[in-house]
Design a protein with these regions (language model features):
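A glycine- and small-aliphatic-rich helix-loop capping segment at beta-alpha/alpha-beta transitions
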Residues: 2-8, 26-28, 53, 76-87, ...
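Glycine-rich oxoanion-binding loops at beta->alpha junctions
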Residues: 13-57, 101, 105-106
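Accessory alpha-helical/coil subdomains and C-terminal extensions
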Residues: 124-127, 149-241, 245-248
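C-terminal non-catalytic interaction/assembly regions of soluble proteins
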Residues: 1, 241-265
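General beta-strand structural signal in soluble alpha/beta enzymes
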Residues: 14, 31, 63-65, 99-104, ...
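A glycine/threonine-rich phosphate-anchoring loop and its flanking beta-alpha core
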Residues: 93, 99-166, 176
Length: 265
């Protein structure tokens, strides 16, 4: 807002976690739930879609994306209730699914994920500025890729649920099966015309942050060891491994151990 010309039109909507909102003048801020979606996030997602539909060829859609957007903007597709979306999300988390597996399912159950925001706003110029929290920095995986092509399918979502032995709620199963059979449209894929005027740009990632931490410790005379920027798996298992490493190394020297990635809680 501070850097936008005062006489230029500006409107917008930001959705963030509870207790993370900041005062604004021209852009509305809504707080919602993470990691399980709630009604405030659903309502905000529907409003965001409505705002995007009103954009024309002379408009610019600026999308600021960071991790957590999948839950904060979780408006279920028609035929799936918010309760059912919460149930399947909770089941995926409890099953130890990777963030890739979770996103594969959620992209096909919500209205903005998997490139659907770009599809809705395709009349306008679009620029998505992305802070990555995922291994590999794929725009399609960050916040479930609202502005990026989706390489996965409803068949993939069903396969993930079956592999994890999750029995989805009826609405979820019916939607995914209808989509897999071609009776409902899937998410927009690479090459879809809706992405012709949309640019996805990763402006910050975990590796850059980790290297900044390494430099900070070294500048203060503390040796730093970057273990990995691709840590994944169950959070408890990863924590035990890190604790064991700290216990073994701390006996001999002062050392900062640094790692990044995305674990499943």
């Amino acid at each position: 807002e501070a850097h936008w010309p005062a006489d230029a039109p500006l409107s917008g909507l930001v959705v963030t976690r509870y207790l993370h909102g900041l005062p604004t003048r021209r852009i509305e801020v809504v707080e919602a739930s993470h990691p399980l979606p709630d009604g405030r996030g659903e309502a905000a997602a529907l409003r965001m879609l409505d705002m995007s539909r009103q954009l024309g060829p002379d408009d610019l859609l600026l999308v600021l994306i960071s991790g957590g957007g999948s839950s904060l903007l979780a408006a279920p597709v028609e035929g799936v209730t918010l309760k059912e979306l919460r149930q399947v999300t909770k089941a995926l988390l409890h099953a130890g699914a990777s963030i890739h597996d979770i996103n594969t399912v959620r992209k096909h159950l919500t209205r903005l994920s998997g490139g659907q925001l770009a599809q809705t706003a395709q009349a306008a110029h679009g620029l998505a500025l992305i802070i990555s929290d995922v291994v590999g920095d794929d725009p399609g995986s960050i916040a479930s890729g609202p502005c990026a092509p989706d390489a996965s399918s409803c068949v993939d979502a069903l396969d993930q649920l079956q592999r994890l032995r999750i029995t989805p709620p009826a609405g979820v199963r019916h939607h995914l099966e209808a989509c897999a059979a071609g009776r409902l449209p899937d998410t927009p894929k690479p090459g879809n015309a809706c992405f012709a005027r949309m640019e996805n740009r990763v402006i910050a990632c975990a590796h850059g942050s980790l290297m900044a931490a390494v430099r900070y410790f070294e500048q203060h005379g503390i040796p730093a060891l970057l273990l990995s920027d691709k840590v994944g798996g169950d959070a408890q298992s990863v924590a035990r491994q890190h604790a064991a490493l700290v216990h073994a190394l701390a006996r001999r020297q002062t050392l900062a151990l640094i790692s990044g990635g995305e674990t499943t809680v």
